[in-house]
Amino acid sequence: MRLVTFSPQAGGAPRVGLLRTDDEVIDLNHVGGNPPFDPADMNSLIAGGEKAISWLRDVASGSRDAVALGQVRLHAPISNPRRNVYCVGWNYLDHFEEGAKARPQKVDLPAHPAFFTKAAGTVNGPYDAIPFDASVSTQIDWEVELGLIIGPGGKNIPEADAMKHVFGYAVINDVSARDIQRRHNQWFKGKSLDGSCPLGPWIVTSDAIRDPGNLRLSTRVNGALKQDSNTRHLYFKLPRIIAELSLGLTLEPGDIIATGTPSGVGYARTPPEFLKPGDVLETEVEGIGLLRNRIGN
């Protein structure tokens, strides 16, 4: 199943929908039948667990009125995250190696996942503009990533059980201000500018992705291919990420994890390349979907 957060083009509050086809969305606010979650809130749906999934399957199998996708505005599927977005750095060997060439000091490949976060306010819609302010940063860079959405929460999750805690997947671009990263000598600030985490275009539930460890992912800028890889090249696989992140830290339903980016980022190119106002950034993960974001308002 593919789940969206949308609002009608004519206006109205955002609400949760279920894609019936590639071109139609069922408005869960109008289905009735006493859903076991708040149909205006994706976090509530995810927290609803198996009862919510069972109810959605009944909706998907029934005959329901739907709205044309072209008549709605898609928001980030989780538009108001309850917590920061968890991220994994240096999780593709080729990206670590390209970064090593651009770094002034030698850094050893981590023996454990390198975690950091992006502020909750970074989350942006799948087709919304990414803010650009040259007085803040002139080195805005791209990073395609597979986004993982936690379903059942947990703490100290065994690696063998980790995938049972996945609700679904989405596309993420971990947009990064490289000059700010260097200025502060850490990741958080340079990766936490408002609107710097386009997410979506929907959540694909975990049962619909046969092998999340074998998905092509790519970035295009103005139509030119910049990143092209596959999640099979993840250095730390998804179960390891979940298990290590949950050590002593309770993961909650709706938590978002960006699992790392492959090579091809702008700062490691010769000469370096960065996004400019008017550029169109396209971010795609096989089996999930495509984000298309213009740089600048």
Residue ranges, per PLM feature:
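Short beta-strand segments
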Residues: 7, 87-88, 117, 143-151, ...
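Short acidic-glycine loop/turn motifs at beta-strand connectors
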Residues: 9-10, 19-24, 150-152, 221-223, ...
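Catalytic-pocket segment enriched in acidic/His residues
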Residues: 13-14, 50, 54-57, 67, ...
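A gly/proline- and charged-residue-enriched helix-loop-helix capping module
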Residues: 109-127
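Non-heme Fe(II) oxygenase catalytic core, chiefly the N-lobe of the double-stranded beta-helix
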Residues: 125-162, 167, 172-175
